[in-house]
Amino acid sequence: MGVEKIKAAFENGKKAFIPYVMGGDGGLEKLKERIRFLDEAGASIVEIGIPFSDPVADGPTIQRAGKRALDSGVTVKGIFQALIEVRKEVQIPFVLMTYLNPVLAFGKERFVEKCLEAGVDGIIVPDLPYEEQNIIAPLLREANIALIPLVTVTSPIERIEKITSESEGFVYAVTVAGVTGVRQNFKEEIHSYLEKVKLHVNLPVVAGFGISTKEHVEEMVTICDGVVVGSKIIELLENEKREEICELIYATKQKEEA
């Protein structure tokens, strides 16, 4: 469980496909059902969003999903309960994407305890600066839960090395400046940025933000170790276009054999 389980998703040249689902969008039964579907479809890790009223890193699609979840009365406690229940049925690693505020409001010790109970293997906190990681990092380390770092196009290499030196799991490389969301294409400099990150860190590098097509997936996994797809997954789940999700997963796995 925990850090080792995330490591296993990248072993032997495996390319990781990491779909993002908003916890409680459509209800908690829907969350469990979607996790079961993504596990069966061959996703490597599932990223579960904790809805928050001020989601600074989220684009419009994810913001709307979070608002739907909050409007329906979904709570952090409820999401943990759903994860505890579905964990009995699936082995796929769970990574939580949460802003710092919900963690502190819930109580950080209690939050980490619930992560353990629900079989959460890693967490991403996009608004937690590296300099303030000690707010939660020691508790997570003790629980063998990875605190996954985000690096951006504008991060100098020295900072990337510093941020990732004590990290575990994988490095989340943000591929665009700005918020999440669907994009048409990626600029050339993104390629050199990802190659630079790969060169300077000792963890798998996963690209995320704006990845929405098979072409994007193929492009990104030739350079790095996996992709996170968020806004597009929410859109496809909402419109019941699940075969397109399977195609994105297939596009990732094809690159393992290349």
Curated annotation (Swiss-Prot):
Coiled-coil intervals in this record?
none
Do you know which SUPFAM superfamilies this protein is assigned to?
Ribulose-phoshate binding barrel (SSF51366)
Query: What residues form the catalytic site here?
Result: 47, 58
Give the catalysed reaction(s), semicolon-separated. Answer: (1S,2R)-1-C-(indol-3-yl)glycerol 3-phosphate + L-serine = D-glyceraldehyde 3-phosphate + L-tryptophan + H2O
The catalytic activity of this protein is classed by the Enzyme Commission as 4.2.1.20
Q: Which CDD domains match?
A: Tryptophan_synthase_alpha
Q: Which Gene3D superfamilies match?
A: Aldolase class I
What does UniProt give as GO cellular component?
Answer: cytosol
InterPro entries in the cross-refs: Aldolase_TIM, RibuloseP-bd_barrel, Trp_synthase_alpha_AS, Trp_synthase_suA
Look up the record and name the pathway of this protein: Amino-acid biosynthesis; L-tryptophan biosynthesis; L-tryptophan from chorismate: step 5/5
Alphabetized, the UniProt keywords read:
Amino-acid biosynthesis, Aromatic amino acid biosynthesis, Lyase, Tryptophan biosynthesis
Q: Taxonomically, which superkingdom?
A: Bacteria
MF (Gene Ontology): tryptophan synthase activity
Q: Which family does it belong to?
A: Belongs to the TrpA family.
Function description: The alpha subunit is responsible for the aldol cleavage of indoleglycerol phosphate to indole and glyceraldehyde 3-phosphate.
Q: How does it assemble?
A: Tetramer of two alpha and two beta chains.
The name on file for this protein is Tryptophan synthase alpha chain
UniProt organism field = Bacillus cereus (strain G9842)
